């Protein structure tokens, strides 16, 4: 059982670790891709603005024909040359605020009209530099935010890895607390440091049964001195076991309630109604045939007794009286059978009407119960699992199972007061076990081959 739990927990941990690594890789890749795209976009934009400026500065003087009066005020170098009293360094972009632009504009406005046209194109270029600088500054701030996000993701992933390793230690319950603290992040090393399993003595009771009972007792009593993660696991198992037992106890508690309602509430009313408004004595033809057969057998016995006991008296005076008493007894017997039949039908209808809403509204508890039963089944060793499967299949679809199905079908017919049909029972016995056997084989092929192939091998070996 310990090896099975260890392999199952190891597989679950490996799957969770793989999913977490893939998710972390996607997050890292997306953030780094976004960061690289922002950096590349800023570099390209800055380079494009710079080269465009250099191209405009290299244009000849004849481009300024629309403003011929500017030649008098500036040399014939370029129409975009800055004034001598305010040099502009285009080698590095600087942050230029709106206030500085407005001050420069107002200061240059007092000059002659020849300078006005120059200021328009110049401050247009300076506005481009300002917008570029602000954009780059904003992107740099975004890069800092991205770096902080990456650091936060690394911290969270480290913490998550630490807690995952703590949970993984529950796979190896024989590892002490010192090893747990010394190796919080090394799963493979923890595997290598496991202690050997203590030898268990052989007894008449299978060890898997004793281990299952011990585990069940530990889940209920919480007698565990393991670390925090193992303690949480036992708390979860304890809650699962308690919820399952409470749900089963609640369903079993319905049977005493059903018996109480049947005896104290339904039976007096049904009995009074049947005795007052009785239409016929027999509810079906099958009861009538059985009553007639029993009456004939009783009359034959009475006649034989009278003949043997009264050899001298040939009139047989007591025969009619005994036959009449037997008829009255049979009538009372079948009358009681009909009352019990109506009582069972009413009780079953109330039980079904109560049970279905409980199952529908208690789907979560039913799922917990299902998982708990599966866990108890899979906690057994492979031999016990194969033995349980063989026992169930032989009882339901084995060589002698048709006789049991016939008895079950006839009992159901009698329970509900129906007439047995000579065609329904053979048809059911010949088809239903075959369908059930097919479902068993499909379950073994589809489910057990994936979860535990060793169970399938043991099952085939035991069945052969």
UniProtKB/Swiss-Prot annotation:
Keyword Transport: yes
Source organism (scientific name): Adiantum capillus-veneris (Maidenhair fern)
Coiled coil: none
Reaction equation(s) it catalyzes: K(+)(in) + H(+)(out) = K(+)(out) + H(+)(in)
Primary localisation category: plastid
GO molecular function, one term: antiporter activity
HAMAP family the record matches: CemA_PxcA
Disulfide bonds, paired cysteine numbers: none
Family the entry assigns: Belongs to the CemA family.
Subcellular location(s) of the protein: Plastid, Chloroplast inner membrane
Entry membrane topology: Multi-pass membrane protein
PANTHER family reported for this sequence: CHLOROPLAST ENVELOPE MEMBRANE PROTEIN (PTHR33650:SF2), CHLOROPLAST ENVELOPE MEMBRANE PROTEIN-RELATED (PTHR33650)
Single Gene Ontology BP annotation: potassium ion transport
Membrane-spanning parts: 36-56, 241-261, 341-361, 389-409, 425-445
InterPro entries: CemA
One Pfam family from the record: CemA
Protein name (record): Potassium/proton antiporter CemA
GO cellular component: chloroplast inner membrane
Record function comment: Contributes to K(+)/H(+) antiport activity by supporting proton efflux to control proton extrusion and homeostasis in chloroplasts in a light-dependent manner to modulate photosynthesis. Prevents excessive induction of non-photochemical quenching (NPQ) under continuous-light conditions. Indirectly promotes efficient inorganic carbon uptake into chloroplasts.
Keyword vocabulary terms for this entry: Antiport, Chloroplast, Hydrogen ion transport, Ion transport, Membrane, Plastid, Plastid inner membrane, Potassium, Potassium transport, Transmembrane, Transmembrane helix, Transport
């Amino acid at each position: 059982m310990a090896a099975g739990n260890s392999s199952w927990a190891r597989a679950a941990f490996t799957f969770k670790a793989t999913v977490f690594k893939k998710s972390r890789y996607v997050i890292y890749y997306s953030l780094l891709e976004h960061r690289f795209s922002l950096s590349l976009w800023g570099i390209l934009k800055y380079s494009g603005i710079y080269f465009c400026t250099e191209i405009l500065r290299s244009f000849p003087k004849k481009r300024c024909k629309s403003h011929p009066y500017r030649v008098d005020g500036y040399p014939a170098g370029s129409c975009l040359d800055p004034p001598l009293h305010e040099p502009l360094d285009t080698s590095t972009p600087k942050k230029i605020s709106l206030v500085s632009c407005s001050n420069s504009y107002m200061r240059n406005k007092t000059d002659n009209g020849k300078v006005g046209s120059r200021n328009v194109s110049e401050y247009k270029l300076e506005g481009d530099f300002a917008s570029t600088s602000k954009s780059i500054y904003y992107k740099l701030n975004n890069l800092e935010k991205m770096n902080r996000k990456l650091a936060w993701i690394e911290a969270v992933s480290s913490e998550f890895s630490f807690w995952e390793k703590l949970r993984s230690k529950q796979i190896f319950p024989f590892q002490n607390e010192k090893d747990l603290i010394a190796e919080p992040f090394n799963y493979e090393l923890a595997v290598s440091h496991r202690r050997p399993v203590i030898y268990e003595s052989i007894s008449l009771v299978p060890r898997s049964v004793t281990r299952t009972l011990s585990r069940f007792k530990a889940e209920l009593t919480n007698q565990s001195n393991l670390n925090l993660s193992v303690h949480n696991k036992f708390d979860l198992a304890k809650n699962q076991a308690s919820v399952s037992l409470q749900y089963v106890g609640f369903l079993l508690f319905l049977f005493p309630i059903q018996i109480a309602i049947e005896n104290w509430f339904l039976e007096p009313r049904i009995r009074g109604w049947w005795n007052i408004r009785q239409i016929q004595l027999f509810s079906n033809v099958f009861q009538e045939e059985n009553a007639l057969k029993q009456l004939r057998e009783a009359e034959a016995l009475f006649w034989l007794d009278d003949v043997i006991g009264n050899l001298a008296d040939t009139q047989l005076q007591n025969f009619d009286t005994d036959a009449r008493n037997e008829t009255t007894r049979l009538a009372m017997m079948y009358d009681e059978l009909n009352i019990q039949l109506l009582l069972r039908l009413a009780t079953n209808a109330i039980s079904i009407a109560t049970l279905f809403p409980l199952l529908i509204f208690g789907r979560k508890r039913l799922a917990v119960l299902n998982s708990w039963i599966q866990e108890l089944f899979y906690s057994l060793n492979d031999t016990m699992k194969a033995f349980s499967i063989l026992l169930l299949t032989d009882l339901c679809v084995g060589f002698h199972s048709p006789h049991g199905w016939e008895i079950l079908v006839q009992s159901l017919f009698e329970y509900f007061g129906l007439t047995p049909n000579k065609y329904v029972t053979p048809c059911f016995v010949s088809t239903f076990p075959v369908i059930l056997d097919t479902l068993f084989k499909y379950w073994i092929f589809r489910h057990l081959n994936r979860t535990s192939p060793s169970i399938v091998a043991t099952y085939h070996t035991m069945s052969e």
